[in-house]
Amino acid sequence: VLTIFLTEDSKKKLNRDNPQLNLLKNVKIFYKTKKELDNYCSKDQLTHQSLVAEVKHVEQPILKEFIKKNPDKKNITLVILEDVTDPRNIGSIIRSAASFNIEGIIVKERSFPSESKLLYKSASGCMELINIFEVSNINTTIKYLKSKNFWVSGFDLKSNKDFTNHDWKGNNVLLFGS
């Protein structure tokens, strides 16, 4: 977090004196009116709760480098999102993936809204907890992962298989989208 903008009312709720709770120790804080925060957020069609944070863009790793650095790691689980482009949906998936200890999410670089403030807001702080691998071609990436002993599982509403009965040991890729 680089900068925090908040209203005078939210200032009262912020405890900056307790070092154990002081997560904003080295962060610049500016006090604004609710209207100023509304104006700041309206251009991106965002809402706020009397607090707006300006964050540094998180540099994401490269998939092949990640695989090379973890050659002996077992039970890696990755998620591929194919043609999932809505920032709210992607943010929600990032939150879920972080809660299930997914190692990373693979997305097509041309259709991933990496600079979307709505994506960051929808991810609710989980962008920093999960690797996002941007790739140029999903099919080539799947072939590469298969060559590195990953099992790829696609999901279909009409399938008669129950994924909860599947043995998820080993390296897995969960494919969502079209």
Report the location of each language-model feature.
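Amphipathic alpha-helical repeat scaffolds
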Residues: 85-93, 137
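Active-site/ligand-binding-proximal alpha/beta "capping" segment
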Residues: 153-178
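Short, glycine-rich nucleotide/cofactor-binding loops
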Residues: 78-88, 108
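N-terminal positively charged helical leader segments and presequences
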Residues: 1-68
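Short amphipathic alpha-helix with an adjacent loop that forms part of the alpha/beta core around
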Residues: 64-71, 144-148, 164-168
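Histidine/lysine/aspartate-rich catalytic loop segments that bind and position anionic ligands
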Residues: 103-161
